[in-house]
C-alpha cells in the first residue's frame, strides 16, 4: 500500500499474496504445482508469461514490476504424522494466511484451516493451537520451526514468487536514461542472485 500510494517509492519481496486485496487474479501465481520444474518456472516468469502477468495484473494497480523471482518452494511441516499422500492432511490443524488460494487448497485437502499471522506460528505450534504450517525451507530453519515440528514433507507444492516493484508514477517520472539504468541494474542483480535463491 505504501508503494502504491507513493509514500514509499519501491520495495523488494512483494509476494503475490500481498496483492490479493487489490486484485485477486494475481493468485494465479499461487496455484499449486503450476510448474513441473524450477527451470520451467524460471523460463515462464522470465519470459512472456511473466511479462504479461506483470503488465496485465500488477502494473494496473499502480506498480512498475522491475523483476520477478522465486523465493523458494513451499514445504509442509507438522506434528501429527508423515504426509505421504493428500489424504494425510485430513483433520490436521493447518496454519495459513488469509490468502483465498491457499485457504481453498487446504480446504480441498480436508485440513482443518487456522488463519494465523506468521509471527504467531512458532508459539501456535508449541502450544498446539496449530499442528502444521507451510513455508520455504529457509524460512522454517530461520524461524527455528524444527524445534516445534516433528515431520517435514518436501512437497514443492507452491513456488513462491517475489517482485521488485516501484511506484509506476515514480518510474514514469524518471528520465529514460535512469529508467534504463535501473532496469539494467535489477536484471544484473537478479542474474547474480538467482543461483542462491532456491
Task: Specify the residue positions occupied by each region the protein language model found.
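N-terminal secretory/targeting leader peptides
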Residues: 1-40, 48-198
Amino acid at each position: 500500500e505504501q508503494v502504491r500510494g507513493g509514500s514509499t517509492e519501491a520495495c523488494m519481496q512483494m509476494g503475490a499474496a500481498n496483492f490479493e486485496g487489490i486484485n485477486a487474479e494475481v493468485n494465479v501465481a499461487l496455484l499449486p504445482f503450476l510448474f513441473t520444474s524450477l527451470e520451467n518456472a524460471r523460463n515462464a516468469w522470465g519470459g512472456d508469461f511473466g511479462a504479461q502477468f506483470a503488465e496485465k495484473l500488477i502494473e494496473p494497480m499502480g506498480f512498475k514490476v522491475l523483476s520477478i523471482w522465486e523465493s523458494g518452494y513451499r514445504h509442509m511441516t507438522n506434528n501429527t504424522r508423515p504426509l505421504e499422500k493428500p489424504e494425510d492432511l485430513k483433520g490436521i490443524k493447518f496454519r495459513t494466511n488469509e490468502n483465498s488460494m491457499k485457504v481453498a487448497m487446504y480446504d480441498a485437502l480436508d485440513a482443518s484451516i487456522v488463519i494465523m499471522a506468521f509471527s504467531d506460528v512458532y508459539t501456535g505450534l508449541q502450544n498446539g493451537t496449530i499442528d502444521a504450517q507451510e513455508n520455504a525451507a529457509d524460512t522454517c530453519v530461520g524461524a527455528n520451526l524444527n524445534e516445534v515440528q516433528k515431520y517435514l514433507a518436501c512437497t514443492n507444492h507452491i513456488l513462491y514468487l517475489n517482485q521488485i516493484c516501484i511506484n509506476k508514477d515514480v518510474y514514469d517520472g524518471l528520465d529514460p536514461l535512469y529508467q534504463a539504468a535501473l532496469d539494467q541494474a535489477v536484471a544484473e542483480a537478479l542474474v547474480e542472485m538467482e543461483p542462491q535463491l532456491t
